[in-house]
């Protein structure tokens, strides 16, 4: 299974160095400046060429845009000039600037990159310096992402040997800690992107389980996987029902990280892992059905989060549950009108087999509770309705606990991942009632994102719970900001930040 960034991003050497004592050895040097600063540039390799380029109008030093400047000097590094405004760089601008610089370096296949840290960041206190180092490394690695292709003559992905941050003054411990966390967050996100981008004939529930087991082995996590027989024996009717129409049987995947002596205060993170979604008997339209390779984006987000946790090894407890199936039409597939029994014992009237994500999540949520979760976050490409409401820019949120959401929202603010809370009034909960079962899985009319989320939340029972509908944000038609076309790995950084903070 080809995962584009699994190797080189682990191997790239990243460090911070004091500028005064350093001999810069690089294929590319990244510098920041306003137009006026570049016009009078000095003190870095290629400064004269940079000044001449700006004066002649070759580039305008637009904020967060990266420009290649030919120095004209033999064996000299390529200069990548990144524009900025007069005001101090924000964390969002810093991430994006480094992502743009990385994309330029990938395009020109430059392997050793040096970044001259702006004075504003050098003068920061230790806490701010750690944050800035985090943003720079994270932004660079997110921008360096390259999707695997399956072309006969495809070039191998460009790899980076080193990324060095050069600062006039250096709070070494703070910078090193920021580098460590920034790299971990980026690696978790790019891992999730890789999984999301895999074709549906490559990634099926069993191979997703294999990926999870490999991740567990890499980071020393506890893991177990339930196969279809065990799923049936346990009475996980939601997951079993969705998966029974496919020749690729379902899997319930569990990863456990215990960072404290006692198994208490446990974050339960639950991901929807539909490796391909045809809609089942309630068949989707053919247009854009190929994008349903991303219907396991919630599972990818949670595995990416466990990658971050495994690297940073915080004093936290986390149980990750992935409910994985392939939703296919067949003679034995789930049908509209069927009534199934979930792992919780609640019965569900299936009105639409294309509302399958909430069925598998129902069992995943109950299993996470059984395994000790004391608070729950689920992520799923759950509804098309969230894209109508929020587009591909913002992740929709439904919750039963405003205090828990406030913590999560603060984390999202720090990671610059946009989220928006939707209402959860009792009237919406009432819409889930069925005449023939405890719940129905589809509701006619509007409020589809809200009611789908609340369906999942039913299985949280009394626990604090946050639902993330990433159907609009998990897979993009074109690149935007630090996110590439295709799988984005959305919410990895925010979920990890919530747990770590």
Protein language model annotation of sequence segments:
Residues 1-8, 15, 87, 209-501:
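A generic structural signal for tightly packed, nonpolar segments enriched in small/aliphatic residues
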